[in-house]
Amino acid sequence: MIAQGVTKANRGSQVANPSEFDLEFENVEFFPRYEDLVLRGWYLPVDLKSPTLIFVHGIGSVRSGNNAVELASRLVERDFNVLLFDLRGHGSSDGDKASGGYFERWDVLGAIDYLLELGIDSHRIGLIGFSMGASASILAAADEPRINAVAVDSAFADASDLIAREAARATPFPSWLTPLFIPASNLIAKGIYGIDIGSLVPERAVSQLDFPVLVIHGIADQRVPWEQGQRVSDAAKEGSVMWLLPEVGHVDSFLEQPDEYVVKVSEYFDERLR
């Protein structure tokens, strides 16, 4: 039941549309790398020669969640192309399971492949991931040497550390009881769903990246404690930046500090991709 609870994807509806921000956009479809699921999203073009950012949302969210379209509009103003898409099992994309980033990394790799087919320079593609999307972004970058820029918001360091917390949220079991079931749940996740929870360790994957990353985390995050983000930052290449925001919750940093958020994110990607 724990394995089912933490892999269940709640398919939500879009909460915003690029047209609300007077943005030019295209409805797009593409496939994950290695699979035939259809992923759907929006591509916001500026110029093929401009850097392109791929937004990767968290579990239970959608491409437009957490004010993503507003953030995208601010980055389009700063001459970035943006691709927002629904991960498998979310929004309008195919699939019915979430995997904490394990299979979602293939979705991110598929988004990269889609941009390459458009003619985007592979060395001018950056990833910005939120919560589970942060995990998927780090894992994808570790598998794709052409990526050299990743920003993560509310990232976890090791999935095993969060299984009990997430299981208590997603199942009827009390938080003190769920740790007792974790070993069996790991075996079930591997045997039934093909998810190797032991490999969902972004702090290990980020250490394989040969470039600095930007890590953003709210100190008041009750879902993924800020110390998890600190571990990711500590494991990343020298020169990585950790931005901690007091009294800010899970994936709320842009909502609470929109102007500074845009400046920090755009400056990071400008330095890495231009």
Locations of regions flagged by a protein language model:
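Conserved alpha/beta-hydrolase
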Residues: A72-D94
